[in-house]
């Protein structure tokens, strides 16, 4: 399963997003991805930085998007449709959030 975790990192020198938010978003993304993969047993494919996510361009707090798989991939689609695996996915995400906030 392909896992991607994205956060907004502006490509321009005159960014409207602070370095603190970018750094915190990177930490959030990396932490969530690590715990998500260790909980689900899925491969960690790394963090993808992307500045094309218009829905999160103006965030003032750490932000990340977790792609948990691709419905276009029959194996991933079947796994994500399984209620038992959905619970594992939720636990992995919760573990990452808890770790980020130091719980």
Residue ranges of predicted features:
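Active-site-proximal helix/loop segments of hydrolytic enzymes
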Residues: 4-103
